[in-house]
């Protein structure tokens, strides 16, 4: 009896699979892992597989930005229309995340990952073959966004949180960093492919490679997470006394403000991320330099995401949001007066270092100020708002370029949206301090 408490769990075995029934299908879920699997080597190995899957599944978000100048020239469309594949992809990503999360809960995460592999793989291949601009856009939104990327973000983050207790925060941060790792790796790889074999062949190769690799990795994710009681909130994340009046506002008003804040910060964030390659091309530096800047930006974003998580544990979600918003605004301002090659590299690095912690801070804010029973739905809603912001901002920047002939107005537009985000964060901070003062001054009721 005592030995089972000391048995080290190393992963699913053949007997596990036999008990599950191999006739259920190659990607059918295995039974839940034992509780000894939590924080184990098997969990660490699963986290590594998760990181690979998110890095592969998120590639389309960044490859589409790299090929934008070639797509615009090939299809003979405007810069705004060339931005629409990214816009539709992000909208599909946001909607699909909720659908794939529901599928993962019912059928196991491997099922959603297989659909993701099919979506990313077929999306790349069909987009590379089509000669219709609107079909090209719809493929990005439906196959690559709705089915593909969505399967490798929210479901993987949720799954990771169930395999860790002591190191849950850093595990989730590592998992979420796969999205930025994709941004650090794929732009340069895609640009090399575009320069050597063209964007269409690059898409075909990415499609075949992604489909096969993601499907094989999904086989390693069939084990259901250990069954355990609801987790205890992390230290320093206690809810406010009256969770029905977050920030001294109604829950609907407070949530609506966070939704708009998420939208606004990502409209601003999307300008450099979506258009830096095209911007460098227009300045005469070439698409390759722009791809390098995008990779640098997102490599620094990985560092930013991890460091911001540690900062958030110390100062809370709302202050982390304000800090990130101020710094992101400073980075956007640096793009206005400087357009030299070295200056753009520096501005890209600073932008990556400054903005990585903004989006994760919304989850902490909701955990700190709203009822825990509503956390899942509210976090999902605000994260979707950030994706809508990325989609809207990518299109708006392209449209402003078409209207003005440069990206100067697009950067100013991004700064304006960033100010809206900061204004909401400051307002919520003021409302929270005021509600706490009123609570302290109110007479105690016997």
Predicted regions and their residues:
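Extracytoplasmic
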Residues: 45-79, 100, 186-187, 272-277
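Extracytoplasmic gate region of multi-pass secondary transporters
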Residues: 64-68, 252-306
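Conserved MFS/SLC helix-loop-helix module at the cytosolic interface between two early adjacent transmembrane helices
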Residues: 95-133, 312
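Hydrophobic core of transmembrane alpha-helices in multi-pass small-molecule transporters
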Residues: 135-150, 263, 343-356
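Helix-loop-helix hairpin linking two adjacent transmembrane segments in secondary transporters
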Residues: 179-225
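A late C-terminal transmembrane helix in Major Facilitator Superfamily
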Residues: 183, 369-404
């Amino acid at each position: 009896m005592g030995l089972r408490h000391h048995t080290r769990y190393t992963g699913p075995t053949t007997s596990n699979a036999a008990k599950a029934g191999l006739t259920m299908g190659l990607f059918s879920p295995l039974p839940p892992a034992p509780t000894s699997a939590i924080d184990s080597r098997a969990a660490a190995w699963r986290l590594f597989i998760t990181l690979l899957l998110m890095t592969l599944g998120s590639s389309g978000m960044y490859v589409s930005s790299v090929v934008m100048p070639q797509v615009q020239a090939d299809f003979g469309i405007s810069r705004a229309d060339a931005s629409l594949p990214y816009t539709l992809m992000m909208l599909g990503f946001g909607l699909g995340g909720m659908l794939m999360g529901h599928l993962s809960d019912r059928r196991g995460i491997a099922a959603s990952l297989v659909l993701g592999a099919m979506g990313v793989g077929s999306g790349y291949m069909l987009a590379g073959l089509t000669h219709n601009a609107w079909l090209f856009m719809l493929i990005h939104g439906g196959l690559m966004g709705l089915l593909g990327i969505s399967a490798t973000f929210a479901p993987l983050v949720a799954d990771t949180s169930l395999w860790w207790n002591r190191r849950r925060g850093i595990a989730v941060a590592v998992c979420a960093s796969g999205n930025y790792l994709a941004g650090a790796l794929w732009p340069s790889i895609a640009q090399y492919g575009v320069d050597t074999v063209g964007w269409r062949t690059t898409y075909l190769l990415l499609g075949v490679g992604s489909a096969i690799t993601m499907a094989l990795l999904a086989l390693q994710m069939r084990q259901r997470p250990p069954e355990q009681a609801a987790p205890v909130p992390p230290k320093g994340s206690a809810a406010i006394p009256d969770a029905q009046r977050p920030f001294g506002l109604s829950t609907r008003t407070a949530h609506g403000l966070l939704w708009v804040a998420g939208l606004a910060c990502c409209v601003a964030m999307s300008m450099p991320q979506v258009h830096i390659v095209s911007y460098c091309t227009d300045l005469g530096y070439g698409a390759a330099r722009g791809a390098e800047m995008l990779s640098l930006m997102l490599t620094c974003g990985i560092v930013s995401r991890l460091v911001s998580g540690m900062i958030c544990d110390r100062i809370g979600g709302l202050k982390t949001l304000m800090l990130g918003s101020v710094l992101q605004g400073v980075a956007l301002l640096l793009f206005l007066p400087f357009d030299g090659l070295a200056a753009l590299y520096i501005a890209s690095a600073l932008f990556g270092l400054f903005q990585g912690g903004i989006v994760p801070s919304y989850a902490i804010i909701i955990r700190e100020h709203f009822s825990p029973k509503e956390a899942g739905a509210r976090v999902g809603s605000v994260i979707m708002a950030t994706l809508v912001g990325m989609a809207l901002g990518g299109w708006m920047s392209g449209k402003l370029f078409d209207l003005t002939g440069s990206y100067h107005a697009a950067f100013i537009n991004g700064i304006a949206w960033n100010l809206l985000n900061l204004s909401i964060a400051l307002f919520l901070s003021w409302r929270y301090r005021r509600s706490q003062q009123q609570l302290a001054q109110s007479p105690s009721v016997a």
